[in-house]
């Protein structure tokens, strides 16, 4: 599963204290989106000016602390993130297996007070439907309360 953000939230994304997973990818491009970094299914290259190094881009897209995104658009290999492990440039999401998600949830189960549990949100959660469904089934087997936030336009 492609997850671009995760963390605990109390009663905003469902009842009680919840572990919220923001899933990468959305089929809409709403101008008011609270999580625009989660829109593109393939992810977005994120830059941190405090840590960026010009030398990680062989195409000259980085000058000082600025990134010329017009150069990035044509880049196929993204050497800045595939060949360099740096805080300066990174992909907007991390990959997790369903089992890794379930293990993390079970390790944090004591935090689900006041009817809490897990919420999957986005992006649009149904863009990763198979992984989402498998996660929901496995969490239900462990009696974890689940919720999804969806725009209801994808499936």
Feature map (PLM): residue ranges:
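N-terminal pre-triad scaffold of radical SAM enzymes
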Residues: 3-52, 63-76
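Primarily extracellular surface-attachment and macromolecule-engagement regions
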Residues: 1-2, 96
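Conserved Radical SAM active-site core
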Residues: 40-155
